């Protein structure tokens, strides 16, 4: 866990107390600079907001300024910490690139199983895509969005609404609400 420039280790008891003090938990994967997490935590003080990113340096500024209900975890999206199992009622992935985007496009088993593991039953998963990042990986925006939608559906996620593109903004939001297929919970 990072707070400003300090890396902290939170023991199981402290983490349990932090989690039990919040009925709703948002986990943002690939949180980048942490602005989304900081802003979300400030807007919803009754919700625990956890940002996960592999790059420690990006998180320093916003983790220092974040409210107490924000937690920043240094971890790779392809190897999510076990402590997050069945915690999230909402998971967000905002503008993925690199290995996170590749994992979504290819259905990387570690990423997909990690998503399944951290989500509570009927959790929502919201993914916002960047056309430029998709283009760098050889995918037009609409085709990349459809590919990710198909990968998630084939992995056993129950899709409640179809994907839709906000073409004028170059961003695709997909899917807005997902729940896990009941038979696939560990």
What is the predicted role of each segment?
Residues 68-77:
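Conserved SAM-binding strand-loop segment of SAM-dependent methyltransferases
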Residues 89-106:
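A short SAM/SAH-binding and catalytic strip from SAM-dependent methyltransferases
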Residues 137-186:
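Class I S-adenosyl-L-methionine
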